């Protein structure tokens, strides 16, 4: 199935010169959404995954159904102040400074095999910070899965040798 037909491209959003890739049409199509989830589930089946980890907010939208299909748990990664219990944090570079992500300190048990799931791989900052969080807790990052990769933004370089599944490519 060609999932690219379910992605809306919005020029100059959120700012001039940026093309935003909106996954809302994909989610609105039961056929396309379930196909995308099944593709990631199939990828995960070969990796003996114990836990899905997804950064807010669209990582929840993709990661939770994958976790349900696999019959395993989901651990959210959020911005500071959004998780109610003890957290660990990791910071990463953004275009205009640092940003921080947090995860509950007990979200991952040492040795658990984790698949990180998000909608988009661009510069790789979010996924690299998520990898750092998982590894701080002793988890093993078995792979990463994304609906979309924006080519030319060097996201793969940021995540290094971690195995990666991408369903669609768009220019960055």
From Swiss-Prot:
UniProt GO MF annotations: adenine binding; adenine phosphoribosyltransferase activity; AMP binding
Subcellular localization(s) per the UniProt record: Cytoplasm
A Pfam family assignment: Pribosyltran
Keywords linked to the UniProt accession: Cytoplasm, Glycosyltransferase, Purine salvage, Transferase
Any one GO biological process: purine ribonucleoside salvage
Xref: CDD domains: PRTases_typeI
E.C. designation(s): 2.4.2.7
Residues that span the membrane, as ranges: none
Gene Ontology cellular component list: cytoplasm
Pathway: Purine metabolism; AMP biosynthesis via salvage pathway; AMP from adenine: step 1/1
EC class (word): transferase
Keyword Glycosyltransferase recorded: yes
Keyword Cytoplasm: yes
Alphabetized InterPro entries for the sequence: Ade_phspho_trans (IPR005764), PRibTrfase_dom (IPR000836), PRTase-like (IPR029057), UPRTase/APRTase (IPR050054)
Reaction catalysed by this enzyme: AMP + diphosphate = 5-phospho-alpha-D-ribose 1-diphosphate + adenine
Quaternary structure note: Homodimer.
Family the entry assigns: Belongs to the purine/pyrimidine phosphoribosyltransferase family.
Described purpose of this protein according to its UniProt entry: Catalyzes a salvage reaction resulting in the formation of AMP, that is energically less costly than de novo synthesis.
Protein name (record): Adenine phosphoribosyltransferase
